Amino acid sequence: MKIEEAIRYFERELEKIEEAEAIEASAAEPDEELLHAWSYEREATGMALTALRVIHARLVCLGIDG
């Protein structure tokens, strides 16, 4: 898998996580443990996405096709 593909994958996953988190938060009685879990998942996915973007930028600077 190329880095660009991995970035797109994690972008889609982050959108899904944010949507699920928003749906749970808007529930009549949101499950706080589930919201906490979604928060961790969102943060971890965001960190992975940031790392991939940094790696991609470095490869581009080096003239390497990621």
Language-model-derived ranges and their functions:
Residues 1-2:
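Absolute protein N-terminus
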Residues 8-12, 19-65:
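Short, charge-rich amphipathic interface segments used for partner binding and complex assembly
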